[in-house]
Amino acid sequence: MEVQSLLNFDLDPGPVDQSILVWQHEHRSAAIWEDEVPPRELTCRHKLLGMRDWPLDPLVCQKLIEFGLYGVYKVAFIQLDYALITALVERWRPETHTFHLPAGEITVTLQDVNILLGLRVDGPAVTGSTKYNWADLCEDLLGHRPGPKDLHGSHVSLAWLRENFRNLPADPDEVTLKCHTRAFVLALMSGFLYGDKSKHDVALTFLPLLRDFDEVAKLSWGSATLALLYRELCRASKRTVSTICGPLVLLQLWAWERLHVGRPGRLKDVGASYMDGIDGPLPDPLGCRWRASLSHKENPRGGLDFYRDQFDQQKDEQVIWQPYTPDLLAKIPLICVSGENIWRTVAPLICFDVVEWHRPDRVLRQFGLHQTIPAPCDNEKALHAIDKRGKSEYDWSARHSRHIGLWEARVSSVVSGEPECSPMDYNDPYMEWYRRITRRIISPMNERRPGQFLPTGFAFQVLVQRVAAIHARSRASLEEELTVGSARQTLQDIVDMCAGALQLNAPLGSLSNGSVAQAPTPEPFLMLPQPTPTIIPQKPMGGEMVCLPLNDMEIDDGLAAEPLELMPPVQDIGCEQSLSSVSQKPLFWPSGGKLTFSWVCEVMLVFDWSSKNLPPCEFSSVLPFNVLDELVLFASKILKKEPNCVRIDSEKAEVVVVGDLHGQLHDLLYLMQDAGFPDGDRFYVFNGNYVDIGAWGLETFLLLLSWKVLLPARVYLLRGSHESESCTSMYGFKNEVLTKYGDKGAAVYKKCLECFQLLPLASVIAGKVYTAHGGLFRDVSSFLSDKQERNRKRKRTQKKQTDNTVLDTEDRSESLPLGSLKDLSKVKRRVIDPPTEGSNLIPGDILWSDPSKDTGLFLNKERGIGLLWGPDCTAKFLQDNNLKWIIRGKGAPDERAKRDDLAPMNGGYAEDHEGLITLFSAPDHPQFQDTEERHNNKAAYIILQIPECEELKFQPLEAVSPRPKAEAYYDFRRLIHPPSNLVHNITNSVDSPSSVPDDKDNLISSENVEYKSMDLSEQMEVDEKDDVDSKYSESITDEVAAFGTPASGDRDMVDFSDKTENGSKEADHSETAEISKDLSDTVGKPESCSRTRGTYEAIGTDAKLKSNTPEAINLEPQPGCDLYVPDSGNSTESRTEKAAEEACVGRISIDDCSTTGDAAVELEITYDEKLDRVVTEITGNDAAECMTDGNRDIATDGAENLEPSTSKLNYSEPSEDIDDSTMKFRHNTSCVADSDLETVNGGVNADCSSSSKCLTSKPVVAHDKFTNLTKPSHDKGYGESADKPERVIKLVTYSKRKSSDKKHMIESNEDPQQKVNDSVDSKNKGSLDKSQSVPGDMDS
């Protein structure tokens, strides 16, 4: 490690151990350190100015004394020091309800409230109901009724109170005196305790409590005051808050009593006070002594920067832990010590809607007791979300009954401890623990302009840097061969470094007299490098394993906050030998989010260690959820600011381009060490596909995010086709995350999906090399006529349906216009799955397009998303954009081997066209195939020298071997060996992408996959698909065609022209909130252990029912009609029926739903008896049910939207009027509630004996769960007779209509079936009215 690099490190402000201050990322101190908070003070609001000239009549004063509220009046008008209040807020921690100072935790307790304000603390909680007619209540208790202009909800105008109650009449009667007293107390306590935005109004909340004066004197006004102070401190400590209110006078008095920072000196003591009409001295609380003349000679009064720096350097002797001496307590009024028995109670403090916990067990030194390491506390953060907004009439005593019960038991929860005999030692166990969990430094270490205040922390930073450099220099000398010359040079270097430090820090003390401080304050959390160099093992191409110290990489190392106990070097990264028996310590997030190189190295070591030593379910023990959350949050902030196409330019540097990784963590570790870690002269561009298939996709992605946060201008992560919900749900990443994080897996998966959407789509290196995962894209101007083109296709389809003379000829595709780099700026990339229709198609093009040997640019109709482009397009794109090379990914060798027109990928790269390189960086992929089926491919990465980019240097990689053992998170065997006669259904675009295998570099072929997605960031409504080729039945009858189903030869989708396009204005207002909402609906628990997906497909010989969402289909044509159903995770069976014998006949019927406003379409397909046997053999039952949730509205021609839908599939024996048995597929837009169903997400459960319900983001055809019903008995009369009745399959779809849309409903007095038959016979219509058409997600 270079000594010079150590001279540039900042102090770590803490906490090192984040187990206590878990909300640090939300705290104001984090924003200050990151320079996000303007250097100004908080605005302190209060409403007591209107009380200054409100005279206190002796009669009213006597009542205040009886209530125990007189002390508030006496201290309420002390001037506030805004800078001091702000500096204290920066030290307040909502997690503990204490201030974190360098000397330890300290806080305002019930003792302080009782003594300083004279408020009663031992009594019933201040709470109750607010269900009142406030005008009537004012008239009842105040004797006056406020007018409409004076009464604002539960607030009344302060001017109205002053006008009616400012002057008490002479010789008032008891009623008048009580009314005036109530008005004065109401204005005083409301102004003192509350400081909301209603500056000129007074809260009437306390008025009901003032009815009975005897009860007022018993209430615990002190605990209510402290609760409101805690709540305001917690709220103001958030990084985005700029104001504070509440009883801030109490906070300032407390600070003056206990802390030296900002504390003035009293020029003289204040004597007892008297008032005419009241015998004896008034009961002034201790806080009244600060109403004297003050001086700042001893402790200068400064601004916020000065106070902040003073707190950073505060020492233990500058804190007065026990300011209330016995002599003082003997002189103050008895009410000030009336609650001494509960000063140390651990209990909730209550004031109507506010509940905050009192934690004296964390500050026992304030009570003269020895402080030990306190037990973990839970201050119930959820309580902060409870307030009075929207609850003007609410019974708070009932809402907080549990906490009120705890307060009533306050005496039993008083803490105790051993007396503190002497000041706490610096090395006391509590202090050692505290220094690890606290935030020690608040002042940021950024550059200051000349003449600005320079915090003392800069001096300590210089000292730490010099000592660290001296340590490194000395250690390096000891490791070298020591000569006289080298020893002299080392000593000279140390002298120079010491001289520099002493020159800057002369005031810290004289070293000539030999005096040495007992311990530095504050202690810097800067850990020196470990004696043993950090090692990452690697396997070079020659086959021999070499271990290189990270410190030998030419990178300025950072110093980690908490060094790990490193395991011994391992000579084989995948070895199964026993590693260190010492458990790996969990990672902690560096304070302020400022990552260091050492921290990222620790991440690599931890991930490598856990992959060999821990089961996946224990991964969160080394990478806690809060660390992952911080990492993704910081990375997302960086990615969000990057353009769709990032540009990398440098005068002279090296760029490493990496292809698909697919969760192969250990190969990535070797790759980065082989190529050299990112630094000032080395860039990295990763071309996507970080997750899925491999067993360590999460670690791979998080490691790359760590590098991105560390070096955002040197590491660039582009998006791949597998960074989507559809792929990750199919190829294992979702299951991997849910397995590794258990109950929090759903939240982790959601965060990853949100981060995927922020990844850029492409990069341009030195203006000469274009990189993207898929490749080229079409011209954005071609999207403008999509709607007109769909209308044309729909009219042509209708003409074919009504005119049998029209030949069913396929459209001859025309070459699309090629896009340019300028078009990328118009792309909306924040989509969880790329759209396949509408005006935002470029993301799908970039992620899913493939090269072809044929010229031109065409839709990839076999896949349903992306393009195919020829060498002419490559040449044109390079020429138009002045580029030399195109580097893409998506080149899995097993899939490339299936394409005769493309070169194989076993070497890790291929030149598909002149200037077009396909790169693949996952060696020996996919890792879970059997040995005889493996391609044993090498991988590669590319090194570019910029700005020339004259040549590409291909660096081959072999797989690190052997890899640690791991199980697949997806059913790779089924995907590798699909049944030869299996044809996957293709559901509509609104169907769940979670069941979609997609990338052609995956284990099964995706060449014929039709792909559809949702744009979650824009909340766009999905158009019906028209340009994507779909395979329809060749023998659907004319009756079916009359209802809008396209003819078989057209190969176009049913389209509703008036549907909203992607990117519509209706979606523009929704982005982040809708993303989170939609994503939360798609995430669930892990799939069953079998990791298989159930697929139910009923396909006829001449009529195959298909929908439009991507499902993989075999490349080989299917010889016959299949029925394929997995039987609960066990072996599957399929039956091929002969076309001539089992042809199916379809007819349409309509259910009468006029009474409910639901239009319905029912399709009956008749089969013979064999179908029932197939279903029975496969499922073991004669009845099953599956439900799925749909999550996308469908817009029909009329413009109304369908409500979110649920699909219901069932089959059962028929009733008497139906021959034998009926299978019904139901898609009902009404919400289906079934409380008895157990939620299951993912594949078919191995045990189907219990009912279950599968919830997904969209309806899926690959149904995940069957529900056993009672097995019905067969009619024995049929026996084996050849005259068995036909089986009937009914497909019933419902579309929910608005109650006001009567024109779409079928009249109840009409025969709905007759309407259908008439419509079919007439053949005058191309399709039914939209109310009778099949919804888009159930097109047949």
Swiss-Prot record:
Group of enzyme by EC: hydrolase
Tissues of expression: Expressed in root tips, the shoot apical meristem (SAM), leaf vasculature, hydathodes and mature flowers.
Record-linked InterPro entries: AminoTfrase-like_pln_mobile, Calcineurin-like_PHP_ApaH, Metallo-depent_PP-like, MPP_PP7, PPP_phosphatase, Ser/Thr-sp_prot-phosphatase
Compositional bias ranges of the Basic residues kind: 790-799
Positions with biased composition (Acidic residues): 1018-1027
Positions of region (Disordered): 788-814, 1012-1093, 1196-1218, 1266-1340
Any one annotated GO CC term: nucleus
Superkingdom of the source species: Eukaryota
Phenotypic effect of disruption: No visible phenotype under normal growth conditions.
Pfam families in UniProt: Metallophos, PMD
Composition bias type Polar residues, residue spans: 1203-1213
Biased composition, class Basic and acidic residues, residue ranges: 1049-1080, 1266-1289, 1318-1328
Cofactor or coenzyme needed: Mn(2+)
E.C. code: 3.1.3.16
Function: Maybe required to maintain cell division activity in meristematic cells.
Record protein name field: Serine/threonine-protein phosphatase 7 long form homolog
Taxonomic classification: Eukaryota, Viridiplantae, Streptophyta, Embryophyta, Tracheophyta
